Every structure is written in C-alpha cells, then in structure tokens.
Amino acid sequence: MATVRRQGRIRTSIGIVVAVLVAAACGSDSESVETSFVGDIRAAVDAVEAELGAGQEYFEVTAAPKLTNIFVAVDGATAAIPYVYADGELLPPAPALTGASGFTFTAEAIDVDDKAILTKVAEELPGATIQTLSVEGGEGGSVRYVVAAQSVGGGVLDITVGPDGSVLAVEPV
C-alpha cells in the first residue's frame, strides 16, 4: 500500500506544501471534529474546472481548515499546476512543477460522505487531531482518501479511509 501512495504523489514540492498545511492546521484545540473543510474539496475542484474546463485530471487535492491545495496534472501527467482554494476563491496558479509522475483522477471519481468521513476517523482513533484530508490518484483513475492526524503521542499518522470514513489502514509518517 505504501508503494502505491508514493507512486501517486508528486515528489517535488508536495512534501513542503503538505508540511505547511499540517503546521497551519495544528493550532486547533477544539474537542469537536472539524468537518466543514471536507466540502472544500468539491468546491475547489469545481472552481478549477470552471477556470480550465471540465474533465481536468488531478494528482491530489488536499483540504485543511484554512485552505485547499489542488494539483492539476498537465502535459500528459508529467507536470502539475498547483492551485490554492481559500475563502471560497480559487487563487492564481503557482508555477508548474515539472517532473511529476503518478496516478491521476477526474472530478467524477470523488465520492465521499462529507459529514461522515472525518467523524468516523475521530470515533475509531479517539484523541487524534485531524489536520487534513487528501484525495490521491489511484490505479485506473480511482482515488484514495488519506487523513493526516496527529496522534495522542504527538506523532503524525496517515490514515487511509473509505469514502464513508471507515479506517482501512494507519501508517506513522
């Protein structure tokens, strides 16, 4: 499973972007599960498609409470154009990331229960602080949902979940 994940990620710069997202999301001390940002995944993809046209391919979409990062596959999935969606607005794209590789998906592949996905993680891993939800490209245009959370012990976990939030795998980062 870890091999597929590594293949589905853009190796250059994504780690930095995700680290910034995780750091930005760590400030919450709320006992309730913040799920409002899950809907930003669809809103961000819709905004990209309104800007570029329907049928775009994506490497990854990662939502956090403050913003959503979208990595649009271009040039035959050999490069990615990073966008940020924040406060209901798609910001201008960053420069292309060349040398990208991995699986891609289209908007139609995203099928997630916005209300349940993070709630189930919180129920199954009590005490973990949810930081981000990512939709990653999988084999054959499928998607994989990964929740990043800080464990009670302070470590960061990548939690692979089903569209309904059922925990499928937990990996320390």
Give each language-model segment a name.
Residues 3-14:
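Bacterial N-terminal signal peptides that target proteins for export
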Residues 22-25:
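C-terminal motif of bacterial Sec signal peptides marking the signal peptidase cleavage site
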Residues 27-30:
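Bacterial signal peptide processing site
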Residues 34-46, 173:
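Cationic-aromatic interfacial patches
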Residues 46-82, 135-160:
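Exposed beta-strand-loop-beta-strand "reactive/processing" segments of non-cytosolic proteins
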Residues 79-98, 155-173:
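A short, surface-exposed beta-strand/turn
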Residues 87-132:
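Long, charged/polar, surface-exposed segments that mediate recognition or autoinhibition
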